[in-house]
Amino acid sequence: MFKKPLIFVCMTVIVFLLICGCAAKQEASLPRLIIGCNNYEPYYYADADGEPAGMDVDLAKEACARMGYVPVFRQINWNERDAALESGEVDCLWSCLTMDVLPDDYAWVGPYMRSRQVVAVLEDSPIHTLSDLTGKRVAVRTGSKAEKLFLEMTGENIPQVGKVYSQNQTDEIATALRNGYVDAIAGYAATVRKVLQKENVQYRFIDEELSHAAFGIAFLKDSKTAVRDALSETLSEMLADGTTASILKRYGVDTAKALGGLAGE
């Protein structure tokens, strides 16, 4: 009586296992692209299951799938990223890396998107312009573009702030703002927005921007051009067919600002 259903179930399981086995073998035969990453939400972070997630992760997965590669995300000490590249620990750096900061240090692929450096304050703050930051306390992430801007005053509109507090994690600067330890925080718009919402901080951006940044993927200068060329072509295709915009929109990014003027748009 139960023989036929049992046979059907067994056959279904066998077919499923065969399909999974074939898929695993096929993936195992594909070349790997080992990607060096830095924890910088929402570009790269670990999700609730500890798996890599974020805008850069989603873009890399899509690009690698089209190229016939398997992406391997490896979180590294970002201060030692050059050593990781040179030793072969990673093939490239793909983690909201700004091309204009180190334009000649790497073989670049991109830009694949742009971002804005912004300043956030508490909703009821008297700070409304960059000049209002003069003499104030500003928190930034250690090693970030915002840190460089305030410490070196490398822009015409950068004021002389009273103190720059550098923190290792973005949530630490959000906590500093919420608790009144600093008057403002600065960083990439998507990152600042994400962490302040996550920490439930009532905030606003001041109207003036600190700067714009173009993100790219960094390879060693003597790395294989075939991989770089294939990745560059694939990212252009993703931009042209709307895939990049679709991915960024899932993270609340203003795609008109993030992708406007890039090749393929």
PLM segments and residue spans:
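A ligand-binding cleft/hinge motif common to bilobed small-molecule-binding domains
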Residues: E80-A83, S95-D105, L149-E152, A176-H212
